[in-house]
Amino acid sequence: MSIVNSSTIGVNLGNSDGATALFGLGNTVNGSDGSQWLYVYATAAMVTGTVACYSTAYVAQPATASNLFGAAGGSPNSGMGLAFAQGTFAAADYGWICIRGADQYVRVSSVSTVGAALYLDTASSGVLTTTAASGTMAGIILLTASSTGVQTAVRAYLQYPRLSPGALFGV
């Protein structure tokens, strides 16, 4: 687990702050292992490794194809960013989500291999898969493999996760 190394007092990385905002939405802090964290409001529950999409108002929810591409698919919703929960959030909680760092958790839906291409799982919100699906991801490299067919959190390297340009333009 990363620890904060910015000068912001009271930061609790990887855990929800509960229903009370302790920092301004959109604040960022740096942590150990080259990590960077963003303070958000979660509109839905998230567990460790959940891929979250957040708006320009720093409101986060588990990522789905419809909240990234709109209900009809096609054009990406403007201003949506991607990050990963490193702890448990209840709906209506505030807390820090990870946008960069080594050795962070990501949630995958099935068997995965180190360095494999990752996609947004269309069957489960906030989950990645190595099976070709909607939204090819970039800026995420798995560091550990999963040998189970159920959702699990595995370690990854994150560098400002995003949809690849091909996913944005239907390529």
Please provide the spans of the model-predicted regions.
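Glycine-anchored, exposed beta-strand/edge motif detector
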Residues: 1-171
